[in-house]
Regions:
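Short, conserved charged micro-motifs
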Residues: 288-291
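Predominant activation on well-ordered alpha-helical scaffold segments within soluble catalytic domains
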Residues: 3-8, 36-43, 73, 127-130, ...
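Short Gly/Ser/Thr- and Asp/Glu-enriched loop/turn motifs at secondary-structure junctions
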Residues: 20-22, 57, 273-280
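Conserved PLP-enzyme active-site core in the AAT-like
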Residues: 26, 30-202
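Active-site C-terminal subdomain of aminotransferase-like
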Residues: 117, 159-277, 284-286
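Conserved N-terminal alpha-helix of the aminotransferase class I/II PLP-enzyme fold
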Residues: 1-33, 45, 49
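Structured alpha-helical segments in the cores of large, soluble enzyme domains
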Residues: 3-11, 68-73, 96-104, 222-229, ...
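Inter-helical turn/loop segments and adjacent helix faces that build the functional surface
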Residues: 17-20, 47-56, 243-247
Length: 291
C-alpha cells in the first residue's frame, strides 16, 4: 500500500492525467532498473504494433544524446536494441530535437531526453522535443513516444520550476523514471517509473505469483528487494510534504549557485554552462590560462 501511495504522489507531482485510484507505476532497486522498465515497455509496445501490422520487428532502435547514463547502453545490449546517440558540443550542450528526429525511423521504440544530465547538470528541452516530435509523427504516421530519464530532475523540476513543461502535460511523454536515492532524499537504492496511463504498460510486464499463501503481482526485473527504502520514501513524503521538499531542494540550489558563481570568477576555470538548472554543474580549465 505504501508503495502504491508513493507512486500516486510521484505521478501527481508529474501531472499524470490518469484517473485511476492507483496510478500506473513501479519501483526499482535504483533509477537504472526504472529506466530499464520504461525501455522494456517502449520496446514491447513497438514490437506488438509491428506484429499487428505484419511488419518486421527485428531491428529496434532507441535515440538519445551522447550524455546518456550507462544503464541505457546496458539496456540496449541486453535487449539487442540499436542505440543511436546525438553528439553534444559546446554549441549544443543538450539534446537537439531536430538532430534527434533525424536519427528516427519506423524502428525507433522511443526517444529518451534527460532531465538532469549527470555530467553537465543541464536539462534537455523536452517541451521543444515534444513539439517537434508531434509534427514528425503526424507527417510520418509513426507513434514514437518519449521516455524521460529524470533520475535527478524528477525531484527538482516539480519543486523549483513547476512552470516548465517536461512531464505528462506533454502529448508524447508516456513514461518517466527517477531516482529515489538522489534528490528523492532516500538512502540507496530506490528508483521509480510512472506511465501516463495503464494502456502504456504492456500486460506481459506484470508478473503474478502465489508466494507464501498470497497472490503477488509486480512489475520489475528483481523479485526480492528490501522494503526499507519504500518506508523511507513514504516517510519523507509525509514528514516533509511539498513545502519541505521545496525548501531542501532550494537550499541545494542556493549552495550550487554560490559555488557556480565563485568558480566562474576564477580566471583559471570556465563553467560549462552559464545557467544553472539543477544543483549540479561542471567546470573545466580555461585553455587560455596556461598561455
Amino acid at each position: 500500500v505504501m508503495c502504491g501511495r508513493c507512486i500516486n504522489i510521484i505521478a501527481n507531482m508529474w501531472n499524470s492525467p490518469e484517473k485511476a485510484e492507483w496510478k500506473t507505476g513501479a519501483l526499482g532497486i535504483g533509477s537504472s532498473e526504472a529506466c530499464m522498465l520504461g525501455g522494456v515497455a517502449a520496446w514491447l509496445r513497438w514490437r506488438a504494433k509491428r506484429k499487428a501490422e505484419g511488419k518486421p520487428f527485428d531491428k529496434p532502435n532507441l535515440v538519445m544524446s551522447s550524455a546518456f547514463q550507462v544503464v541505457w547502453e546496458k539496456f540496449c545490449q541486453l535487449w539487442q536494441i540499436e542505440m543511436r546517440t546525438v553528439p553534444l558540443t559546446l554549441e549544443k550542450p543538450t539534446l537537439d530535437p531536430k538532430d534527434a528526429l533525424a536519427m528516427c525511423d519506423e524502428n525507433t521504440i522511443c526517444i529518451v531526453p534527460i532531465a538532469g544530465v549527470t555530467w553537465t547538470g543541464l536539462n534537455d528541452d523536452i517541451e521543444a522535443l515534444d513539439r517537434e516530435l508531434d509534427a514528425y509523427n503526424k507527417k510520418t504516421g509513426y507513434d514514437i513516444p518519449i521516455h524521460v530519464d529524470a533520475a535527478s530532475g524528477g525531484f527538482i523540476l516539480p519543486f523549483l520550476n513547476p512552470e516548465v513543461k517536461w512531464d505528462f502535460r506533454l502529448k508524447w511523454v508516456w513514461s518517466i523514471s527517477t531516482s529515489g536515492h538522489k534528490y528523492g532524499l532516500v538512502y540507496p537504492g530506490l528508483g521509480w517509473v510512472v506511465w501516463k496511463d495503464k494502456k502504456y504498460l504492456p500486460e506481459e510486464m506484470s508478473f503474478s505469483v502465489n508466494y507464501l499463501g498470497a497472490n503477488i503481482t509486480q512489475v520489475g526485473l528483481n523479485f526480492s528487494r528490501p522494503a526499507a527504502q519504500i518506508l523511507g520514501q513514504y516517510y519523507n513524503f509525509i514528514r516533509l510534504g511539498f513545502d519541505g521538499y521545496k525548501e531542501v531542494q532550494q537550499n541545494s540550489m542556493d549552495v550550487a549557485c554560490y559555488c557556480h558563481e565563485q568558480i566562474g570568477k576564477m580566471k583559471c576555470f570556465e563553467n560549462y554552462s552559464k545557467e544553472l538548472q539543477n544543483p549540479l554543474f561542471i567546470w573545466y580549465m580555461n585553455p587560455e590560462y596556461d598561455k
